[in-house]
Amino acid sequence: MRKGSPKKRTLLPDPKYKDTLVTRFVNNLMKGGKKNLAYDIFYSAVDIVGDKTGESGLEVWKKALSNVFPSVEVKRRRVGGATLQVPIEVRPERRISLGIKWMLEQARLRGEKTMQERLAYEIIAASQGEGKSVKKKADMHKMAESNRAFSHFKI
C-alpha cells in the first residue's frame, strides 16, 4: 500500500539576494557539500555578468534561466513492440530543475579558465537567447514537435 508523497522541503532564501531560486541554483552548483564555495562562485559570476552587461546581474540571470526553462519534453512509451517518444508538458517544478541543470551542465563544459567566468558567460549567452543551454531547450522542443503525432498516448 502506498504511503503518499513525501512532504515538500522548504528552502531557506540565500543570504545576499533573499531568493529561494538562488538557493536552488547554488544547491545544484555545489559539489562535495561545499556550499560556501558554491555561493562564492555564483555571486562572483553574477558580479561579472553585472559588469559585462551594465545591468543588474541577478535580473540578467533570471532572464537567462527563463530562456532555458523547457515547456515540453518527450517521454518514452512502449506501444506494440515499438518505443515511441510521447511529448508531454513539463510540470513547473521540473521545468525549473531542468533549466538549472542544463545551464550548469553547459557552463561546466565551456572553455573559460574559472567556473565563475564559465557560468557568467553562459548566463550572458542564455539571456540573449544564445548558448548551448538554450540550444538544448530548442532541441527538446524540436523533438516534441516532430513527435506530436503521438501526443494522444497517455504516459
UniProtKB/Swiss-Prot annotation:
GO terms for molecular function: rRNA binding; structural constituent of ribosome; tRNA binding. Keywords: Ribonucleoprotein, Ribosomal protein, RNA-binding, rRNA-binding, tRNA-binding. GO terms for biological process: translation. The keyword Protein biosynthesis does not apply. One of its GO terms (cellular component) is small ribosomal subunit. InterPro entries: Ribosomal_uS7 (IPR000235), Ribosomal_uS7_bac/org-type (IPR005717), Ribosomal_uS7_CS (IPR020606), Ribosomal_uS7_dom (IPR023798), Ribosomal_uS7_dom_sf (IPR036823). It comes from the Bacteria. Disulfide bonds: none annotated. Gene3D superfamilies: Ribosomal protein S7 domain. One of the primary rRNA binding proteins, it binds directly to 16S rRNA where it nucleates assembly of the head domain of the 30S subunit. Is located at the subunit interface close to the decoding center, probably blocks exit of the E-site tRNA. Belongs to the universal ribosomal protein uS7 family. Part of the 30S ribosomal subunit. Contacts proteins S9 and S11. This is Small ribosomal subunit protein uS7. It comes from Amoebophilus asiaticus (strain 5a2).
